[in-house]
């Protein structure tokens, strides 16, 4: 065995164990820190409670409004982002050359890497005033503004996953469909998109999870 192979076979298990130990330590730390609250209030009271006053003389830790608001905003952001993401994926698959498609996907991946804090700041500086002005509201800090900013954040995930899946199925069926005289657009609508349904659902779940993580 070469020295490099020996080094790799020795370092990989150590790194894997280190990551696992870090994860276990994080879970234990959170459990230890949360234990006083779990003793003070039951799980039912925490999940169904409507008040959040952790610093009061008699602390109240109700999460129902926080959970419901997170679900609502995340679902609304998915409603905005999913049709646009699928449409963009179809356009990238059928409407542009492979070189332009690769450039667009690289740009989208770069957008996905923008930190959430920066996206939130831009949303606060741009989206909130725009919503306030457009709908003549007293304030633009609303569920609509939050969902639109979240939709921008999760859109790259949807586009990337859907494009990869759609392109895979398109290459698989396109030649046969053209041989049968079926147009590319009809092939996309009748064959490719139904075949990629599972991947589209998976990308939706991942995007929804990302949105929930940001809102919580």
Where are these regions (language model features)?
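N-terminal, non-cleaved signal-anchor transmembrane helix
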Residues: 1-71, 75
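Residue-level signal for discrete positions within transmembrane alpha-helices
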Residues: 66, 70, 106-113, 154, ...
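Transmembrane helix boundary and interhelical loop/hinge segments in multi-pass membrane proteins
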Residues: 84, 96, 161-175, 184-186
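Generic hydrophobic transmembrane alpha-helix motif, especially the helices
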Residues: 109-151
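Transmembrane alpha-helices
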Residues: 161-162, 184-216
């Amino acid at each position: 065995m070469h020295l490099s192979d020996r080094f790799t076979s020795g370092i990989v298990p150590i790194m894997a164990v280190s990551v696992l130990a870090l994860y276990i330590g994080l879970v234990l730390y959170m459990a230890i820190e949360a234990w006083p609250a779990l003793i003070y209030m039951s799980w039912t009271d925490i999940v169904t409670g409507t008040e959040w006053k952790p610093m009061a003389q008699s602390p109240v830790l109700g999460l129902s409004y926080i959970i419901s608001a997170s679900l609502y905003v995340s679902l609304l952001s998915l409603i905005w982002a999913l049709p646009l993401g699928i449409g963009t994926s179809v356009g990238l698959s059928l409407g542009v050359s492979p070189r332009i498609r690769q450039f667009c996907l690289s740009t989208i991946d770069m957008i996905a890497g923008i930190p959430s804090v920066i996206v939130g700041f831009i949303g606060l500086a741009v989206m909130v005033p725009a919503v306030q002005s457009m709908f003549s509201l007293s304030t633009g800090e609303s569920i609509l503004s939050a969902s639109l900013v979240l939709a921008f954040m999760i859109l790259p995930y949807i586009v990337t996953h859907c494009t990869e899946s759609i392109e895979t199925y398109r290459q698989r069926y396109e030649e046969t469909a053209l041989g049968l005289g079926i147009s590319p657009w009809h092939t996309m609508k009748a064959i490719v998109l139904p075949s990629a349904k599972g991947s589209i659902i998976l990308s939706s779940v991942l995007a929804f999870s990302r949105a929930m993580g940001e809102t919580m």
